[in-house]
Amino acid sequence: MAAVRSKICGITRVEDALVAAEAGVDAIGLVFYPKSPRAVTLRQAKAIVAALPPFVTAVGLFVNATRGEVGGILDELPLDLLQFHGDETPADCEGHGRPYIKALRVRPGEDIAARCLEYCNASGILLDAYVPGVPGGTGESFDWSLVPRGLPKPVILAGGLSVRNVRVAIARVSPYAVDVSGGVEAEKGVKDAEKVRAFIREVRNA
C-alpha cells in the first residue's frame, strides 16, 4: 500500500505549523469558519502560510461561505487546496481556480459512492462523523465499516482520530490520507507538539 498522507487541521499558530512540518506532515488546514473555535483571521493565516516550508500543502477550510468570501481569501492568501465542509453543491466548490476536496458526514444509509460521483471534479472526498448541526471538528469517530472499498475518489479519513486509533483506522479503511484536529490538541486551537509528532509517526508506521 502507498504511504498514507497526513493533514493537521485547525492550525492557528505559526509554531504549531512548524512542529507539524518538521514532523513530516503533508498538509495543514486553516479554518475560515467564524463559528469554529479554531478559526483564523486573515492575518494569522498569512503568517502561517508564509512560514511553511516547500511541499507542505496549505488547505483552506470553508463552511457554506459565499463565492465572494472564498474569493476574498484567495485574493490575499496563496492557498494550495480548498476544503468545503458544509452543504456546498458541486457548483459552489468549483470555479475558484484551486483544486478542492469535499467533506461528507457519514451516517448509516448514506450512499457514499453516489455522493462521490456528485463531486466528480473533486480532488478527494473527506469522510467525517455525522453530528447534527455541527459541520466538523467534533472529535467524534464513525463506524469505519460504512466506508465502501473502491470509491472513485481518494479518501481522506477524519473524525475522532488520535494516536491511539489511527493505525487501526488506516488498516480498516485504507485511506489516501488521514486528517486530525482535536486528537492532537492541548486545547481547542492549540496543538500539543508531542501528540502531533506521535500522530504523524503512527501514520508513517501504519
Swiss-Prot record:
Belongs to the TrpF family. Its EC number is 5.3.1.24. GO terms for biological process: L-tryptophan biosynthetic process. GO terms for molecular function: phosphoribosylanthranilate isomerase activity. It is an enzyme of class 5 (isomerase). Transmembrane segments: none annotated. It comes from the Bacteria. The keyword Acyltransferase does not apply. Gene3D superfamilies: Aldolase class I. HAMAP family: PRAI (MF_00135). This is N-(5'-phosphoribosyl)anthranilate isomerase. Pathway: Amino-acid biosynthesis; L-tryptophan biosynthesis; L-tryptophan from chorismate: step 3/5. Pfam families: PRAI. It comes from Azotobacter vinelandii (strain DJ / ATCC BAA-1303).
